[in-house]
């Protein structure tokens, strides 16, 4: 059995197929975690969702900002933009089944290997959150996605406030902060105020901001966190950090990491991608 994480696919199903072929993926033997942004900007979003839905327990996805945007568009809470490539899902004959599968996916996952813990999110983890708290907060939002008031939740999900976490937050303010941290976060202030204006590489952080994973006192240090979302960051491999968005949809690569007997044993595997859209 092999364990993998794969970064942002964004509707590039042909690249995903090549990557799975490259690693000789076997659904009966292997487990693959997909770190969100399964859809949008690439040409094959519906195909990606179908592959994931039929993959069962061997393909385990979590939600990114583009996946939530698809749900919002499908429920009339947001209009697709000119750069969105969601029509293949929204007009598909199996649309309802694909969307039902998507809304049942979590915003964070964990995996245990040889007594070690792997925490997976799409974008980031707030410095004040432990791994347990991250999973608990993600479960709060997942419950909303499966509730009767889903269209209202998706309508109210958008926005940048509040930009600072407090355990006292409640209702939509609380859930929006959770969504933003797990699916949009790149930079924050050293004391944890979230920034949503900057998407530069980590070494070009604007004044007063740090990458979320370098915030002082981050409580998930010591737990391996794998994430995507940040294509200008690219591949990053630290003892407690794995960044896996290598810009497939922009003509970069689709990246996977294969773990060995422990989480410290890692192999980076990637395939080149055709450019589906230009950055910007």
UniProtKB/Swiss-Prot annotation:
GO function terms (MF aspect): bis(5'-nucleosyl)-tetraphosphatase (symmetrical) activity
InterPro entries: ApaH, Calcineurin-like_PHP_ApaH, Metallo-depent_PP-like
Enzyme class, spelled out: hydrolase
Keywords for this protein: Hydrolase
Highest taxon above the source species: Bacteria
Substrates-to-products reaction catalysed: P(1),P(4)-bis(5'-adenosyl) tetraphosphate + H2O = 2 ADP + 2 H(+)
EC numbers on record: 3.6.1.41
Cross-referenced CDD domains: MPP_ApaH
Similarity remark: Belongs to the Ap4A hydrolase family.
HAMAP family: ApaH
Biological role: Hydrolyzes diadenosine 5',5'''-P1,P4-tetraphosphate to yield ADP.
PANTHER family associated with the record: CYTOCHROME C5 (PTHR40942:SF4), PTHR40942
Protein name per its UniProtKB record: Bis(5'-nucleosyl)-tetraphosphatase, symmetrical
Source organism of this protein record: Paracidovorax citrulli (strain AAC00-1)
Gene that specifies this protein: apaH
